[in-house]
């Protein structure tokens, strides 16, 4: 039997996904309240969290191969 002693790294993709969703919702609510500065800040947070999500997914795909 061959064992792989390489430690397994668990990548959390769900948290940045949920954070991006929340930031988009908060951005939408800020627009409805006519707080465009907050809306823009939350939109940027959604972009940043989406990039973290993408990186996590890319890492998971590389580990799969």
Give the location of each predicted region:
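Short intrinsically disordered terminal tails
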Residues: 1-5, 61-65
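Short, charge/polar-rich alpha-helical segments
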Residues: 2-14
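Short amphipathic alpha-helical heptad-repeat segments
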Residues: 12-23
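Short, charge-rich amphipathic interface segments used for partner binding and complex assembly
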Residues: 22-64
């Amino acid at each position: 039997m061959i064992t792989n002693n390489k430690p397994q790294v668990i990548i959390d993709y769900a948290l940045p996904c949920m954070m991006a969703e929340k930031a988009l919702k908060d951005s939408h609510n800020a627009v409805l309240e006519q707080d465009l500065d907050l809306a823009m800040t939350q939109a940027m947070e959604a972009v940043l969290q989406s990039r973290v999500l993408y990186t996590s997914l890319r890492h998971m795909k590389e580990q799969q191969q």
